[in-house]
Amino acid sequence: MARIAGVNIPTNKRVLIALQYIHGIGQKNAADILEKVKIPLDRRVNQLSDAEVLQIREVIDRDYLVEGDLRRETGMNIKRLMDLGCYRGLRHRRGLPVRGQRTHTNARTRKGPAKAIAGKKK
């Protein structure tokens, strides 16, 4: 089992799929990484040499923001919005949808489970 960016990637899968187990790397980024390192897309992780794994690791460390660093930056961006007091920050602070969705009905994912209100039943 190869370990890249602090994540154990599965050995029996294709490298293109296995790289997507790393937070911050999707299908496009995984294909770009393999293209830079010149590894065929259909090769499996257990067929990679240690040198190839090292090359992949170096490309990811150099060019991509992944795992904890990406989560930290995302959290800091949200915290910055909340500290500014802008509209998006207020919506984050109140736990409401940020991107203009309606809240009169729906938005249950963001608002949490419905609260019972006495006298609402007919």
Swiss-Prot record:
SUPFAM superfamilies the UniProt entry points to: S13-like H2TH domain (SSF46946)
Entry superkingdom: Bacteria
Pfam families with a match to the protein in the record: Ribosomal_S13
Keyword entries, A-Z: Ribonucleoprotein, Ribosomal protein, RNA-binding, rRNA-binding, tRNA-binding
Record-linked PROSITE patterns: RIBOSOMAL_S13_1 (PS00646), RIBOSOMAL_S13_2 (PS50159)
Region (Disordered): 99-122
GO molecular function, one term: rRNA binding
Gene Ontology cellular component terms for the protein in this record: cytosol; small ribosomal subunit
Keyword Ribosomal protein carried by entry: yes
GO process annotations (BP): translation
The keyword rRNA-binding appears for this protein: yes
Recorded family membership: Belongs to the universal ribosomal protein uS13 family.
Job of this protein: Located at the top of the head of the 30S subunit, it contacts several helices of the 16S rRNA. In the 70S ribosome it contacts the 23S rRNA (bridge B1a) and protein L5 of the 50S subunit (bridge B1b), connecting the 2 subunits; these bridges are implicated in subunit movement. Contacts the tRNAs in the A and P-sites.
Subunit structure: Part of the 30S ribosomal subunit. Forms a loose heterodimer with protein S19. Forms two bridges to the 50S subunit in the 70S ribosome.
Protein name: Small ribosomal subunit protein uS13
Gene that this polypeptide is encoded by: rpsM
